[in-house]
Design a protein with these regions (language model features):
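Nucleotidyltransferase catalytic core that binds NTPs
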Residues: 1-156
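P-loop (Walker A) phosphate-binding loop of NTP-binding proteins
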Residues: 163
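Conserved glycine(s) of the Walker
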Residues: 167
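Conserved Walker
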Residues: 170
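Conserved substrate/cofactor phosphate-moiety recognition/catalytic segment
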Residues: 173-217, 315
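Conserved nucleotide-sensing/catalytic segment adjacent to the nucleotide-binding pocket
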Residues: 198-245
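A glycine- and Lys/Arg-enriched "phosphate-lid" helix/loop adjacent to the NTP-binding pocket
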Residues: 243-310, 317, 323, 330
């Protein structure tokens, strides 16, 4: 392949996917430097600064920039379409370009306007059969085509949380089955079973560390969703409830566990006794303690009520909303909590 001094790649990267990665990588391999212009578009689904950050993280050697204001997207919008784009690019590009890499036919005309050579990459989408439009319509179904940095940014981790005997473990499994995604079981149950229900203060640290390690291990699967049964806040509350104190490391692990949403389960289910449960008459107090912890820490949460299929349906509604808000500015949905 011919080598170029400075090449241009222009795109929306909404979101950045493996087709875009192929395009930029080809430009990098054939150029001393590559300038990537992330198109600042009207009514953007994903803010331009977030899209720029994805490209910068995925390709740290590329020069990434954008235009200050949105520009026409089709020549039919104005007779000055190519003049506007040429003048804008010449103004914002730090270096003159001698090649334009693109996967769309427009690249040929753009290259001509910039007095550069045009390099077409995978026009027929044979190497990477995907489009950003199809990804936006079905992020989970097209997950494998997203760039690694976008996958990390878009992934949602949901914690099922609350007092005893509210169906946390059951709901966690049901959600995982519904979305065909992995889940993390409550590590405390393993410890309690091993101790035949007779746990001590020192076990709380084991529970917190073990549960967090299980979450980290599950995240390595790199799936779009992960469901987690309880968290370190739960261990904090139970440590104080059972032993009147807590290990200093618990707060450390609470800070590490930033879930996209907590599904706080209400106490509207009957008590079912088993070896893992201790306070049948204090669920109401514990529920309010659970909620208070989320409020003071600024955690995103929704209260889940209902029995049987209705409970699952209510939880699915919030998870679906979380998924639909995946492309907002922060990278993490902030739903209105039902309080």
């Amino acid at each position: 392949m011919k080598h170029y001094k400075c090449s241009l790649v222009l795109g929306k990267f909404c979101p950045l996917h493996k087709g875009h990665m192929l395009l930029i990588q080809r430009a990098l391999e054939a150029s001393d430097m590559v300038e990537v212009v992330v198109d600042n578009i009207m009514d953007e689904v994903i803010p331009v600064r977030r899209r720029m950050q994805w490209v910068k993280q995925q390709f740290p050697t590329a020069i990434v920039t954008t235009q200050e204001h949105p520009l026409p997207q089709d020549p039919s919008e104005t007779t000055f379409f190519w003049d506007i784009w040429r003048d804008t690019l010449l103004r914002i590009l730090p270096h003159p370009v001698d090649a334009v890499f693109a996967s769309e036919p427009y690249g040929e005309r753009l290259a001509k306007e910039l007095s550069a050579e045009f390099v077409m990459v995978d026009l027929d989408r044979k190497s990477v059969p995907i489009s950003a439009t199809s990804i936006r319509k079905d992020m989970i179904g097209q997950w494998q085509y997203l760039s690694p940095v976008v996958q990390q940014d878009m992934r949602k981790v949901i914690c099922v949380y609350g007092p005893e005997s509210t169906g946390k473990s059951t709901l966690t499994r049901q959600l995982a089955q519904h979305y065909h995604m992995p889940y993390v079981e409550e590590f405390a149950k393993k410890v309690i079973n091993e101790k035949n229900g007779d746990i001590c203060y020192e076990d709380m640290e084991t529970i917190v560390v073990g549960h967090h390690e299980a979450i980290v291990e599950a995240l390595r699967q790199n799936t779009p969703l992960l469901f987690v049964d309880t968290d370190a806040i739960t261990s904090k509350l139970w440590s104080n409830e059972l032993f009147g104190k807590e290990s200093p490391i618990i707060e450390e692990y609470i800070a590490k566990q930033r879930f996209d949403i907590y599904l706080l389960l209400d106490i509207d289910l009957p008590w079912v006794n088993d070896i893992h449960r201790y306070r049948p008459n204090e669920r109401d107090v514990f529920f309010h303690q659970c909620e208070e912890q989320l409020v003071v820490r600024g955690r995103n949460y929704a209260i889940i009520r209902g029995k049987g299929k209705q409970r699952l349906s209510n939880a699915i509604e919030y998870v679906d909303r979380l998924i639909s808000h995946s492309f907002n500015a922060s990278g993490s949905a902030r739903l209105e909590s039902e309080k």
